[in-house]
């Protein structure tokens, strides 16, 4: 199959699933596995592209917030820095493990189900208050973001869940989750770029551009949709989807093996 077509499809999947609480890694691992795709799946050009694309989505949707954070809300900037540290440490320390052993389909099945139950419980017990982020919130949600490095967990899913457990309003927890993910995604893009330089990887710029555009456009749509959705509805729709996806992956794995 044409590599450009794969880039478009996987870029769209990345843009949508990076920001919805359904795990982008699960979808990017499972989609090529289902269709038997190779090539672009292991391309550093594409890895960098989707990170850049989703970063563009975040900056487009929250550039006004970032201006306020840098020039007026310095405390929020400090909280974002503190919240980014756990994921940074975990990403460097466990990178090889995450990229190899933890990408097994059955591990993704387990994490999809377990985090779904966590999301459901958080919806029931969370107080959902509209209040300012505290240092404690930043530490807890930042630690949750580190856990999201495990495939199937979902960065937005686990961080919004952590915010709900801390008593934050659903939509506000999602917004802080997105702000917190910005430096993490930027860091991932820079790490991949560094790896590409280190190994002398030659970039396929057509795949890069297609990946950036498809991930950025769908990412913007996904962010705006989720923030609007969570102002009115609970996380149940995404919880049920996670469980459905887990069953599909398990059945496919069972019948293929």
From Swiss-Prot:
Keyword presence, Amino-acid biosynthesis: no
Q: Name one GO molecular function term.
A: undecaprenyl-diphosphatase activity
- Read off the InterPro entries from this record: UppP (IPR003824)
- What compartments host this protein? Cell inner membrane
Record-annotated membrane-spanning stretches: 4-24, 51-71, 78-98, 106-126, 133-153, 171-191, 207-227, 235-255
Q: Please write the reaction equations for the catalytic activity of this protein.
A: di-trans,octa-cis-undecaprenyl diphosphate + H2O = di-trans,octa-cis-undecaprenyl phosphate + phosphate + H(+)
Under the heading Pfam families, the entry gives:
BacA (PF02673)
Q: Which GO terms describe its biological process?
A: cell wall organization; peptidoglycan biosynthetic process; peptidoglycan metabolic process; regulation of cell shape; response to antibiotic
GO CC, any one term: plasma membrane
Keyword match Hydrolase: yes
Membrane topology, record value: Multi-pass membrane protein
Q: Which UniProt keywords apply?
A: Antibiotic resistance, Cell inner membrane, Cell membrane, Cell shape, Cell wall biogenesis/degradation, Hydrolase, Membrane, Peptidoglycan synthesis, Transmembrane, Transmembrane helix
- Record's family? Belongs to the UppP family.
Known function: Catalyzes the dephosphorylation of undecaprenyl diphosphate (UPP). Confers resistance to bacitracin.
Concerning HAMAP family, the annotation shows: Undec_diphosphatase (MF_01006)
Instruction: Quote the protein name from its UniProt record.
Output: Undecaprenyl-diphosphatase
